[in-house]
Amino acid sequence: MFAGPGSAAVNVASDGAVGQVGIGLSFGLIVMAMIFTFGHVSGAHINPAISVAFFALRRIDAARLAGYVAAQLAGAALAGVAIIAIVGTEGHAGATVPDLHGVGGAFWSELILTFFLALVVLVVATDSRAEGSMAAIAVGGYVAMAATGWGPVAGASMNPARSFGPALAANVWTSHWVYWVAPIAGALLAVAAYHLLREPHAPAERS
Protein backbone atom coordinates (compact mmCIF):
# COMPACT_ATOMS: atom_id res chain seq x y z
CA MET A 1 0.00 0.00 0.00
CA PHE A 2 3.06 2.25 0.29
CA ALA A 3 5.32 1.24 -2.59
CA GLY A 4 2.74 1.18 -5.38
CA PRO A 5 0.70 4.33 -4.68
CA GLY A 6 3.91 5.98 -3.50
CA SER A 7 5.53 5.40 -6.87
CA ALA A 8 2.52 7.00 -8.57
CA ALA A 9 2.78 10.04 -6.29
CA VAL A 10 6.54 10.31 -6.81
CA ASN A 11 5.99 10.11 -10.57
CA VAL A 12 3.77 13.19 -10.43
CA ALA A 13 6.06 15.06 -8.05
CA SER A 14 9.12 14.32 -10.20
CA ASP A 15 7.51 15.23 -13.53
CA GLY A 16 7.32 11.65 -14.75
CA ALA A 17 10.72 10.35 -13.62
CA VAL A 18 9.27 7.00 -12.55
CA GLY A 19 7.18 6.40 -15.67
CA GLN A 20 4.24 4.08 -16.21
CA VAL A 21 6.46 1.01 -16.48
CA GLY A 22 8.17 1.94 -13.23
CA ILE A 23 4.82 2.33 -11.51
CA GLY A 24 3.65 -1.02 -12.82
CA LEU A 25 6.82 -2.74 -11.66
CA SER A 26 6.54 -1.11 -8.24
CA PHE A 27 3.06 -2.56 -7.78
CA GLY A 28 3.93 -5.98 -9.15
CA LEU A 29 7.20 -6.43 -7.31
CA ILE A 30 5.83 -5.38 -3.92
CA VAL A 31 2.89 -7.78 -4.33
CA MET A 32 5.34 -10.53 -5.22
CA ALA A 33 7.51 -9.76 -2.20
CA MET A 34 4.55 -9.68 0.18
CA ILE A 35 3.25 -13.04 -1.04
CA PHE A 36 6.68 -14.63 -0.69
CA THR A 37 7.04 -13.12 2.79
CA PHE A 38 3.58 -13.47 4.30
CA GLY A 39 1.75 -15.94 2.09
CA HIS A 40 2.40 -18.84 4.45
CA VAL A 41 1.36 -16.75 7.47
CA SER A 42 -1.93 -15.11 6.49
CA GLY A 43 -2.38 -15.76 2.80
CA ALA A 44 -1.11 -12.24 2.01
CA HIS A 45 -4.42 -11.15 0.52
CA ILE A 46 -3.60 -7.43 1.06
CA ASN A 47 -6.81 -6.76 -0.88
CA PRO A 48 -10.44 -6.73 0.35
CA ALA A 49 -11.68 -8.00 -3.03
CA ILE A 50 -9.45 -11.07 -2.75
CA SER A 51 -10.53 -11.62 0.84
CA VAL A 52 -14.18 -11.46 -0.27
CA ALA A 53 -13.40 -14.05 -2.95
CA PHE A 54 -11.88 -16.40 -0.37
CA PHE A 55 -14.92 -15.85 1.85
CA ALA A 56 -17.25 -16.68 -1.05
CA LEU A 57 -15.16 -19.78 -1.68
CA ARG A 58 -15.57 -20.66 2.03
CA ARG A 59 -11.86 -20.59 2.65
CA ILE A 60 -12.22 -18.01 5.44
CA ASP A 61 -15.12 -17.23 7.78
CA ALA A 62 -16.90 -13.92 8.35
CA ALA A 63 -14.82 -13.04 11.41
CA ARG A 64 -11.56 -13.53 9.56
CA LEU A 65 -12.89 -11.60 6.57
CA ALA A 66 -13.74 -8.66 8.82
CA GLY A 67 -10.33 -8.81 10.48
CA TYR A 68 -8.47 -8.99 7.19
CA VAL A 69 -10.39 -6.08 5.66
CA ALA A 70 -9.95 -3.94 8.78
CA ALA A 71 -6.20 -4.59 8.76
CA GLN A 72 -5.97 -3.89 5.03
CA LEU A 73 -7.78 -0.57 5.35
CA ALA A 74 -5.77 0.48 8.40
CA GLY A 75 -2.51 -0.33 6.64
CA ALA A 76 -3.61 1.53 3.53
CA ALA A 77 -4.60 4.59 5.56
CA LEU A 78 -1.23 4.68 7.31
CA ALA A 79 0.56 4.25 3.99
CA GLY A 80 -1.42 7.13 2.50
CA VAL A 81 -0.48 9.41 5.38
CA ALA A 82 3.17 8.39 5.05
CA ILE A 83 3.16 9.17 1.33
CA ILE A 84 1.71 12.63 1.97
CA ALA A 85 4.28 13.23 4.72
CA ILE A 86 7.20 12.26 2.48
CA VAL A 87 6.15 13.35 -1.01
CA GLY A 88 3.68 16.10 -0.20
CA THR A 89 0.20 16.65 -1.54
CA GLU A 90 1.31 16.73 -5.18
CA GLY A 91 0.15 13.47 -6.69
CA HIS A 92 -2.54 13.09 -4.02
CA ALA A 93 -0.76 10.10 -2.47
CA GLY A 94 -1.37 8.10 -5.64
CA ALA A 95 -5.16 8.40 -5.44
CA THR A 96 -7.14 6.64 -8.16
CA VAL A 97 -9.79 8.54 -10.13
CA PRO A 98 -11.50 7.82 -13.48
CA ASP A 99 -9.43 9.38 -16.24
CA LEU A 100 -9.40 8.52 -19.95
CA HIS A 101 -12.91 7.12 -20.37
CA GLY A 102 -14.80 8.43 -17.36
CA VAL A 103 -16.69 6.44 -14.76
CA GLY A 104 -17.85 3.81 -17.25
CA GLY A 105 -14.33 3.06 -18.41
CA ALA A 106 -13.12 2.97 -14.82
CA PHE A 107 -15.87 0.59 -13.74
CA TRP A 108 -15.42 -1.94 -16.52
CA SER A 109 -11.63 -1.84 -16.47
CA GLU A 110 -11.58 -2.38 -12.70
CA LEU A 111 -14.13 -5.20 -12.91
CA ILE A 112 -12.34 -7.05 -15.72
CA LEU A 113 -8.83 -6.54 -14.35
CA THR A 114 -9.89 -7.72 -10.89
CA PHE A 115 -11.73 -10.70 -12.36
CA PHE A 116 -8.53 -12.02 -13.90
CA LEU A 117 -6.45 -11.08 -10.85
CA ALA A 118 -8.79 -12.99 -8.54
CA LEU A 119 -8.91 -15.95 -10.92
CA VAL A 120 -5.12 -16.14 -10.98
CA VAL A 121 -4.99 -15.93 -7.18
CA LEU A 122 -7.67 -18.58 -6.65
CA VAL A 123 -6.12 -21.05 -9.07
CA VAL A 124 -2.51 -20.76 -7.96
CA ALA A 125 -3.35 -20.54 -4.25
CA THR A 126 -6.00 -23.24 -3.85
CA ASP A 127 -5.99 -25.70 -6.75
CA SER A 128 -3.82 -28.78 -6.18
CA ARG A 129 -3.05 -28.91 -9.91
CA ALA A 130 -1.29 -25.54 -9.74
CA GLU A 131 2.28 -24.98 -8.62
CA GLY A 132 1.79 -23.17 -5.31
CA SER A 133 5.37 -21.98 -5.06
CA MET A 134 4.86 -19.94 -8.22
CA ALA A 135 1.89 -18.01 -6.80
CA ALA A 136 3.93 -14.92 -5.96
CA ILE A 137 5.43 -14.73 -9.44
CA ALA A 138 2.11 -15.33 -11.20
CA VAL A 139 0.18 -12.80 -9.12
CA GLY A 140 2.94 -10.20 -9.03
CA GLY A 141 3.49 -10.54 -12.76
CA TYR A 142 -0.18 -10.07 -13.48
CA VAL A 143 -0.39 -6.98 -11.24
CA ALA A 144 2.66 -5.47 -12.94
CA MET A 145 1.15 -6.06 -16.39
CA ALA A 146 -2.27 -4.66 -15.44
CA ALA A 147 -0.87 -1.60 -13.67
CA THR A 148 1.49 -0.82 -16.55
CA GLY A 149 -0.99 -1.25 -19.37
CA TRP A 150 -4.20 -0.06 -17.76
CA GLY A 151 -3.06 2.42 -15.14
CA PRO A 152 -3.79 5.47 -17.33
CA VAL A 153 -7.46 4.50 -17.66
CA ALA A 154 -8.40 4.70 -13.99
CA GLY A 155 -5.39 3.68 -11.95
CA ALA A 156 -5.75 -0.11 -12.39
CA SER A 157 -6.39 -0.36 -8.67
CA MET A 158 -7.99 -3.84 -8.50
CA ASN A 159 -7.93 -3.31 -4.75
CA PRO A 160 -10.38 -1.26 -2.64
CA ALA A 161 -7.79 -0.77 0.10
CA ARG A 162 -5.21 0.51 -2.38
CA SER A 163 -7.71 3.20 -3.43
CA PHE A 164 -9.02 3.89 0.07
CA GLY A 165 -5.69 4.81 1.68
CA PRO A 166 -4.72 7.58 -0.75
CA ALA A 167 -8.34 8.83 -0.95
CA LEU A 168 -8.45 9.22 2.82
CA ALA A 169 -5.01 10.80 3.14
CA ALA A 170 -5.49 13.24 0.24
CA ASN A 171 -9.26 13.70 0.67
CA VAL A 172 -9.91 12.73 -2.95
CA TRP A 173 -13.19 10.81 -3.18
CA THR A 174 -14.10 11.31 -6.84
CA SER A 175 -16.19 8.29 -7.93
CA HIS A 176 -14.59 6.33 -5.11
CA TRP A 177 -17.46 3.82 -5.10
CA VAL A 178 -16.15 2.45 -8.41
CA TYR A 179 -13.04 1.17 -6.66
CA TRP A 180 -15.13 -0.87 -4.25
CA VAL A 181 -18.04 -2.11 -6.33
CA ALA A 182 -16.17 -3.05 -9.50
CA PRO A 183 -13.27 -5.00 -7.89
CA ILE A 184 -15.55 -6.91 -5.53
CA ALA A 185 -17.95 -7.74 -8.38
CA GLY A 186 -15.01 -8.90 -10.49
CA ALA A 187 -13.70 -11.06 -7.66
CA LEU A 188 -17.09 -12.71 -7.14
CA LEU A 189 -17.37 -13.43 -10.86
CA ALA A 190 -13.93 -15.03 -10.64
CA VAL A 191 -15.20 -17.34 -7.89
CA ALA A 192 -18.01 -18.48 -10.19
CA ALA A 193 -15.54 -19.02 -13.04
CA TYR A 194 -13.21 -20.93 -10.72
CA HIS A 195 -16.02 -23.32 -9.81
CA LEU A 196 -16.71 -23.92 -13.50
CA LEU A 197 -13.04 -24.56 -14.23
CA ARG A 198 -12.73 -27.07 -11.40
CA GLU A 199 -16.02 -28.88 -11.94
CA PRO A 200 -15.05 -31.38 -14.68
CA HIS A 201 -12.38 -33.09 -12.59
CA ALA A 202 -12.98 -31.64 -9.13
CA PRO A 203 -9.38 -32.02 -7.88
CA ALA A 204 -8.55 -31.60 -4.26
CA GLU A 205 -8.07 -28.03 -3.11
CA ARG A 206 -4.81 -27.01 -1.48
CA SER A 207 -5.34 -26.39 2.23
Locate each region found by the language model:
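Membrane-interface helix-loop junctions and terminal tails of multi-pass membrane proteins
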Residues: 1-207
